[in-house]
């Protein structure tokens, strides 16, 4: 069951977060699961127990993923000037810059809804334990209702369908049925991957 620590809003730290760094960490994690020579030489821990520990850490690292290759927030969660009416209105999600990108599942879960409406355009909703995540304004849906997904599985392609002024990825998040700032998802991914990289360095 997915668990998160709620934050009030998306900070500047998450407005533009390159996943290249995370990818580099992933490569490091994968390298450390090979022969284990570097880790064994640095810490003196080797053998079956060390291999099992490394594998567990790598599996945890791979249990989360960012939804796009690059995270750049173009419109955060909260009140803003509505791009259509010009009036102050609550924005119940977060908008990410995108251009024909594959939208990836952030955690293991199940597709609970797919569809299209005038507001969200084409959308996919995934359930991850107590967390429901919706990806909206897609140009194409790549999964069907009831599909089990793993982290990094493509569920759609970004687009500009529905009530949209241009291509982007709109993400909404409901935690225990309550709308929350999707920035907590990026924080969750960052924290898990950072903890795993640190753990590998200590093995």
Where does each model-flagged region fall?
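Acidic, glycine-rich catalytic/binding loops that coordinate metals and/or anionic ligands
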Residues: 144, 151, 172-203
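Residue-level recognition of beta-strand microenvironments
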Residues: 76, 114-115, 141, 158-161
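Short histidine-centered loop motifs in beta-beta connectors
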Residues: 104-105, 114, 128-152
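Short aromatic-glycine-enriched beta-strand elements
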Residues: 119-125, 167-169
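Short hydrophobic beta/alpha edge segments that flank linear recognition/processing sites
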Residues: 96, 123-126, 150-162
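Short polar/acidic secondary-structure junctions
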Residues: 101-102, 116-117, 160-163, 174
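Surface-exposed, glycine-biased beta-strand/turn segments
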Residues: 10-122, 151, 203
